[in-house]
Amino acid sequence: MEKFKGNKVVLVGNGAVGSSYAFAMLNQGACDEFVIIDLNEDKAKGDAMDLNHGVVYAPSPMQVKYGTYEDCHDASLIVICAGAAQKPGETRLDLVGKNMKIFKSIVDEIMKSGFDGIFLIATNPVDVLTYAVQKFSGLPENQVIGSGTILDTARFRHLLSQEFNVSPNSVHGYIIGEHGDSELAVWSGTNIAGNSLYDILNENPEKQKLIEEIFVNTRDAAYEIIKAKGATYYGVAMGLMRISKAILNNENVVLTVSAKLNGEYGHDDVYIGVPAIINRNGIREVLETPLNTEEKEKFAKSVETLKAIQTPFFS
């Protein structure tokens, strides 16, 4: 689809995830102007210079610069990757207290600029912090999006593709719920090239035992990567890039993001990972993918987990 002209993206937080996202943006050429905001001014300026030197080989012209919160006033999209890092052995939800304070100050500064675009949140715990950004900013719910389970879904599709020796693009299935320990796989709706996974397993019963392993490996992938190299950033950066392109190119594509529920799935007042249609206005619509009884129960528990975390801050 045609790219809207005058696209401006602001990145807040130029750490491992943020800088990986910036590099992905340069390689995919989805915006015209890219601004980096970070407390470490020298690194942000250095990255802007480094990225600009690669523009000549990028698919489209893009201006990259270091900036301040004043640059947010005419941005189409602000991507927040700032916050305290997740440490080995620490769950995403352990981070909430530290990052809530950081986010309040960031969002206040952004809104002072007159910003009225779309927020895309990546910092963990992403569902709770996306909820916080909507509350802090006062923007309409459709204009505040979290990365949600977009990476979990990608991991899920990758692992299934490896097991069945097909392209991940031919694997269709979702991880929904909290981006964290209470997430769940929608096994009942998973298919490979239109063939129900349940039907495939009936024909290949020897693979049945591998299914739970695939989910566990999907859910716990971040912990394994953090143990090995200290942080995850390439995968989530690509997920952020996919959401960004859906917004900037007005794609109306379905992605599993953290979206606000208002009665969908029988729940409300929570941001959580669900399939949603994404376009230039942000979240056009939350889609209610069919769930079986067990999946509904697990999803309800995931909602409870997130509400228990956010309630002390927004009761």
Swiss-Prot record:
Record-annotated active site: 179
Subunit structure and binding partners: Homotetramer.
Record-linked PANTHER family: L-2-HYDROXYCARBOXYLATE DEHYDROGENASE (NAD(P)(+)) (PTHR43128), L-LACTATE DEHYDROGENASE (PTHR43128:SF16)
Binding site for NAD(+): 17, 38, 43, 69, 83-84, 105, 122-124, 147
Regulation: Allosterically activated by fructose 1,6-bisphosphate (FBP).
Keyword terms: Allosteric enzyme, Cytoplasm, NAD, Oxidoreductase, Phosphoprotein
Family: Belongs to the LDH/MDH superfamily. LDH family.
Any one GO biological process: lactate metabolic process
EC number of this enzyme: 1.1.1.27
Main location: cytoplasm
A molecular-function term among this protein's GO annotations: L-lactate dehydrogenase activity
Catalytic activity of the protein: (S)-lactate + NAD(+) = pyruvate + NADH + H(+)
Name of the featured protein: L-lactate dehydrogenase
Residues the entry annotates as binding substrate: 86, 92, 124-127, 152-155, 232
A GO CC term attached to the entry: cytoplasm
Keyword NAD: yes
Location in the cell: Cytoplasm
Family matches, as HAMAP family: Lactate_dehydrog (MF_00488)
Record lineage: Bacteria, Bacillati, Bacillota, Bacilli, Bacillales
